[in-house]
Amino acid sequence: MKSNYSTYLYKMSELERIVNGGDVSSIFIEQDDVLGEIKNFNYDLYTKYDSLVLKDPQTQNNSPKPPSLEIFILVNLIALCGRINDKFPNLDKFLTHYKYATNIFNLLSENIINSIEKFKETLSKDLPSFQLSVIANSSIVKKDNSIIKFLSCFGSFMKLESIEYFGSVFNSLIGEEDQFSLDLLQVLIDSSNEYKKFLQILEFNQLQKYYDDGHLCLFHSIKFDNLNEFKLLFNDSTWCQQQQQQQQINPQIFWFILCKYNSSKIAHYLLNDYQINKKSLKQKNPLEISPVTLLEIAFLCFSDKIAIVLFSQFNYHELLPKKSKMKHLIKSTSTLINNNNNNNNNNNNNNNNNNNNNNNNNNNNNNNSKNIGLTQYTVLEGYFLINIRTRSRIAPFIEVLTMNGIHLTNDIIHTRIKSMSSDSIFRIFTEQYQQQQQNPLNNNQKQIQFNENFTRQQKIDFDNCPNEIDTFILDKTQCNLITLSQEFSIKVRAFTFYLSFGEIFTCSCEDYKREFSCKHMFFILLNYYHVPRNSYLIYQRQFTEIERYSIIMNIDLSKINSRIYGTPNFNTFFKIKSSPSSTTSPFQSINNNNNNNLNNNNNNNLNNNNNNENENKFKEDGDDEILQNLNRLNYILLRDFEFGPNDITTKLRETHINLFDRLLLIEDNLEALDKILKNFTQKGCTLSRDLVGDRNLLVLVAILDSTSKEKLSLLNKYWPLPEKTKKFAIPLIFFAISEECLKMFIQISPNLVKSTLNLHDWISILTEFALINETFLDHYPLLSAWYSDARSVETSLFRLFTCMDKIDCINYLIQTYLLPIPTFKNTLNNFETCYFFETYFLENSSIKAEQYLLEQELLEKKKQKEKKKQKQKQSKSKIINNPLSSSSSSSSSPSTSNTTITSTTPTTTTTTTTTTTPTTTTTTTTTSSPKQKPITPIKKEIEKEFEKIELTTPPPPLATTKQQQINENYDISIGKFKFNRKEENVLGRGSNGTLVFKGIWNNRIPVAIKQMQKMFNPLISKEIEVLITLTNKNCYNIVRYIDQEEDESCVYLGLTLCDGSLQNLVEKGDNNLTLTQFLGYDINSSSKNNSRLLELIKDIVYGIQFLHQQGIVHNDLNPRNILIKDDRFIISDLGLSKMEVTSSYSFTMHAPTGQEGFHPAEVLLEKRKTKSVDIFSMGCILFYLMTGGQHPFGDKFYRIVNILTDKPILEPLKHNLVACDLISQMISKNESDRPTIEKILLHPFFWNHEKKVKFIDASLNLFKDSNGLFTSKLNKLINYQEINLKNNIDSSSSNNNNNINSNVINNNNNNNNGMATNIPFLSKPWNQLIDQTLIEHIINKQNQLNGVGNNKKVIIYSFDQVKDLVRCIRNTIQHHKEIQRLVRQSPSSNGDNKQEVLDCLESQELVLSYFEEKVPDLLLFLYQKFKKHLDSKSLIYFNDLIIK
């Protein structure tokens, strides 16, 4: 050979180089060398050489198979064609350029094509798809003109499928057009007449199918607005033929597609040059459409670019209707035209339109004469669709309307069907669906099919479902259809609507009791709404609060007299996705019955179609999905809604949602809201002023977040916010439950703070708009008492905020209005401050006396009740202490006589003393001065619980000598608590004078009594509220709250008495019990997680999980707060636990009081505390427990510095890398990097052997994936690990008996900034790590499964590949019994460990343990690699095992 350039060409590595860049013909250095290189290249010798190379095990991985003979010749011909100077050469020019071209291949081997004619025959056959893909993709990506010249020369000889493949690559890679794409499209069109017809087809049913399948078609040019490409593909001759055959295609669908993609260039061409050309040729324009209809369709998709084109073409001020404020409709015109009529009909229609226009002009003149001085506004009314594509176009579209003086009105709706035009796009879709709807089922049929529906739905987990469900529990008033919303895509076959069940719906399952929603709602929906069988339901609840409220506000579905309301607590939303099996396109269905759709005279015959026409199921697909949904639900609700006799049918026709409501309440598109408000108010227009009603304002004011605040500011900018509601005339400031909103209204009108309101009206308006539920007043007893009073109750703003505990609003009013007053004292309590505020600022001072007297009345009733209760207790005490007295009264009361006989004990005096003390204390507390703060709701709840305890607690047993001794030892009695303050009785100490004593409750139950100073904790009621919340929950991993008492200076809490703490267990040993004795093994002697240790760790994790599920942050976790009870860990010291909500931020401002070193950097820097604080502390505690008392940030004196500088020291835990990986994530300095409590439980640290086997199976399935998810890059990643050179764990000292580098920690945190290096995970082949006896029989077993004979042995594993190691483990687990039998039958030899191998093959768990011992870090290594590098598609294999 002269050189080896051609040889390089046929190596796959060289093909990869071609793909990545460079011209195909650049492989040949000089043009003259092209022929010589091809002539001197022997293809046969090359293939024989490569086959020999492939057999060499040292080079087999680097020597892929050679390309096929056809691709070999094809690439050479592309290179030859690239040397021709003509832009579009043909075969003759090719032969002329290479005059020896017919003999080019004669010098090659006999198997190679020896002539051009034979090569043309080869082109007409199927070419290898993968190698053809390399050529097509590389040529089009590089925009290599050689491929254009090749197709120009030889495209006519290629098989149609090969040409279509080039078109598909064009469709997927080409976006905006350029000269290369146009030239390539031209040669594709010219290459085959058949393919040309394929490209220029205009039947929308076929276009939809081709586009969904990835073929090049007209939709590509429309999507990217490629005008020149559109001209090449658009051929309206087929439409002309269809017109002659009375199969005219409705142009509205075509324009709808254009508006969907906002293709303004194509629209401008069709409205100008194309229209002029049709007129010059005296041809009918098949795309002719009314300008108003076209603007309505553009509005439907918010096509701002097309709107600009339309306003440049038409004068819409003459076409659109006009409105005025006083006279509703000034001018109306026909907005749509009927394209089904012939030319004669069109002429007649034109004449009629002219007459109508004349009449309209006359009417206008008359109206104008009657309405002189009224301002008329040109308005646009229509429908809109908001989805991913259109959402960003709302603002620019409305801006275009505003610039052209077009006003939007409140008649712009989302889902109304009632007033649709006769031949509008909505009617086309809806009527067609009605024709093809299947016959609905009656109630009996539904009842029969309910169990089938219940078990047929594969998308729902049935494990927790009851066997029977009452299918008749739901009536019509409980099906509250809320609204319809949609995301559109031609390629995604799915539709969505949301349903909400009413408050009356109930279910007996546990899920419903806990969350007020359950899976059975799905089946009721299936049962009653006759959802198509090929649909399935997905539960969806991820809505913001403002979305939930706004959806509720739009309920208007029934004409029944009673209102139907839901609340956010009871709403359940459903998402229905359809994957129909039918291949019928919606466009095909429309076209097949187009005349019937558009003929208004056939409306009465819609349900009398032939059965054959109903066989093809309507395919719910594309941008018409919402329209089909509307009609489908409307159809079912009107004709198939049979919940009972005499029920008024729910009509979907009444459901609508206004565009303004959508932008104001649901969308977070502030720019669009600003544009629509600007449009509403341009030129002083007030047509839509009534859109801002009480409903909108109350939703925004009552649920004020960052977005709603800006929306209110925008409203106030264009339409000043009213001071009061329209219906009740209540000041809106009374609904401002946040400081930001309060400031806004005070800025609008400072005098609003002097307003008062009737509480009955306030509650009524909150109830009417579903802003509160039936349990609202239960949380505010004082409000409840006012509301239950028949008298008119007036209240002030300050008093309302005080009763509702709105501290931020109260503080703002104090700072703004009261602090500047010299006589105001900041030491007053809230009640006194309220009285002071009302004295100075209320306009109607008479309400002060009324409110004061009412509160005094409530306090007096409470005082009398307590006195009565105290007298009853004293009388019982006298009976017990004085038997004679009780005897004298026996005649009048037999029950008293019985009490006297059984109560004669020597300890009655003590009982009397302890009973009297708490009663006196309680009385003193509750009968305070009139100015004292009223009893809080929490106190009321506590007292109710106390009453329950007193009623249900049996009388104490007779006192014994031991009991008397206990009572004598506890010399202090506070209510039901008894204890003493001796040093040996102190269990613990905290900050601010907090002490914990050992004592008893109810004279017999041992408890820990926590004493807290009131002066240091004025918000102690908040802590009690948290404890009560936890007491009502069933959790065994936290300390239980028992009771609460108080005296003048302290509050006493009774808690579970525990055996000790983790700190004492580790550092001192509780009750002579060491940590080793408590665990049952030496924690420093094993690298494995002992089951006892794992259960104790889970105790801590489950306790924190419970708190976080309740929205509570402990905030002070440390070993001292991990207590021991019944040999388990429980969490204590919830004194700083707070609800994790914004309103309680002021209660978490104080620094934590726990030990140093167990709080993250954000706490040390006094930043906001979230649940991640507990995650950090728990990570430190787990390290403390697993290392026997050491800290992950070193010695006590350096911990704070190491925490702030993020320098953990994990060396003591190097023997347990799985735990080390988990803890390293939990103690990250960046709180966003810490896992949630749910993700912690999914970490491999908590995996049992079943999950580990599941992970191995999932890994193997990924390795065998046929869709290319497991790439060579990923294979390389799992064979190497990235080692951080700054790692705190010394890898050289790690457990590495098998020479495996165990340093896999920080794989998730490497930033590849030069401080990391890649080393093999396996430092030696893994077959050297496993017993040879085992590996030999594993291979033998696999050979048997693969059908290999006994005399042959095939090595089926690569021992340097991690994926093969995983495969070996999985195969051993799967066939462990068979392998064990083979090992048992094999002869023994000296030195082998046959018995050890047999033992490890007893079960899958033992097999897994064997491999974990041999390769200890494999699962963690793979887990980290997959979590870091896999995409969402690949993670599907792992389900819930890996969550990023």
UniProtKB/Swiss-Prot annotation:
Active site: 1116
CDD domains to which the protein is assigned, alphabetical: RNase_Ire1_like
Keyword Iron-sulfur set for record: no
EC annotation from Swiss-Prot or TrEMBL: 2.7.11.1
GO cellular component, one term: IRE1-TRAF2-ASK1 complex
Catalytic activity: L-seryl-[protein] + ATP = O-phospho-L-seryl-[protein] + ADP + H(+); L-threonyl-[protein] + ATP = O-phospho-L-threonyl-[protein] + ADP + H(+)
PROSITE patterns per the UniProt record, alphabetical: KEN, PROTEIN_KINASE_DOM, ZF_SWIM
Region (Disordered): 335-370, 584-619, 864-938
Pfam families in UniProt: Pkinase, Ribonuc_2-5A
UniProt record similarity statement: Belongs to the protein kinase superfamily. Ser/Thr protein kinase family.
Protein name: Probable serine/threonine-protein kinase irlC
Species in which this protein is naturally found: Dictyostelium discoideum (Social amoeba)
